[in-house]
């Protein structure tokens, strides 16, 4: 049976995939910095869920990039629908910044948060996974949800997409894996830019796992 490596880690360090946490640390304090990054991301996601303008099942965050210096922590939030979070709120980013600072203790370091809009949100696997999760929570057929997600990626001019759902689908007693593919998804080609995400959704039947691979371009 073939072993599935994470396509992001497989391409990390090359031209197609960059690190989303940019900082250096001594080996003894590396784990502390890693936990700090996780707290920052969790605080941001919790704040977005509580303050956005639509259902709490859809955050619209593509990914979060963290850059650290000696006296500065810079956080860039790549979001597909920024109006859902900051529309009509002049101090939205300031409130988010204060909220994140409360979540972790930073000594002698400033925190700077910026929001960047993603040009084609439905070309981001995290946003698509959240969309599918929201549909599954609303008891929409999993096949219909997957096909609709593939239709949305056509707006982003992607070259291929693969969607996989695993678990007790439709409440069946035996867990199974269902997947659908449209276009090319060359996972073994290193020069191919592949976006990937794994997402967990809790339904009334149990936990379902969603995985999405998107073939963006080839160098």
From Swiss-Prot:
Keywords: Chloroplast, Plastid, Ribonucleoprotein, Ribosomal protein, RNA-binding, rRNA-binding. The keyword Nucleotidyltransferase does not apply. Its main location: plastid. InterPro entries: KH_dom-like_a/b, KH_dom_type_2, KH_sf_prok-type, Ribosomal_S3_C_sf, Ribosomal_uS3_bac-typ, Ribosomal_uS3_C, Ribosomal_uS3_CS. The keyword Glycoprotein does not apply. It holds the Pfam family Ribosomal_S3_C. This is Small ribosomal subunit protein uS3c. It comes from Liriodendron tulipifera. The gene is rps3.
């Amino acid at each position: 049976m073939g072993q599935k490596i994470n396509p992001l880690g497989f391409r990390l360090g090359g031209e197609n995939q960059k690190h989303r946490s940019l900082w250096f640390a001594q080996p003894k304090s590396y784990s502390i910095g890693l936990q700090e990054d996780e707290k920052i991301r969790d605080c941001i996601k919790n704040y977005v869920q509580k303050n956005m303008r639509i259902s709490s099942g859809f955050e619209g965050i593509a990914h979060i990039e963290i850059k650290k210096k000696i006296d500065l922590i810079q956080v860039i939030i790549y979001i597909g629908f920024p109006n859902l979070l900051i529309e009509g709120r002049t101090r939205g980013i300031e409130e988010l910044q204060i909220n994140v600072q409360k979540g972790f203790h930073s000594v002698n370091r400033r925190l700077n948060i910026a929001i960047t809009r993603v040009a084609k949100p439905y070309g981001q696997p995290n946003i698509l996974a959240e969309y599918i999760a929201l549909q599954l929570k609303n008891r929409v057929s999993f096949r219909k949800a997957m096909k609709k997600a593939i239709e949305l990626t056509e707006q982003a001019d992607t070259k291929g997409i693969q969607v996989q759902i695993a678990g007790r689908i439709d409440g069946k007693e035996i867990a199974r894996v269902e997947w659908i593919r449209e276009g090319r998804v060359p996972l073994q080609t290193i020069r191919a830019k592949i976006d990937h995400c794994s997402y967990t959704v809790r339904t009334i039947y149990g936990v379902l796992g969603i995985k999405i691979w998107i073939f963006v371009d080839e160098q």
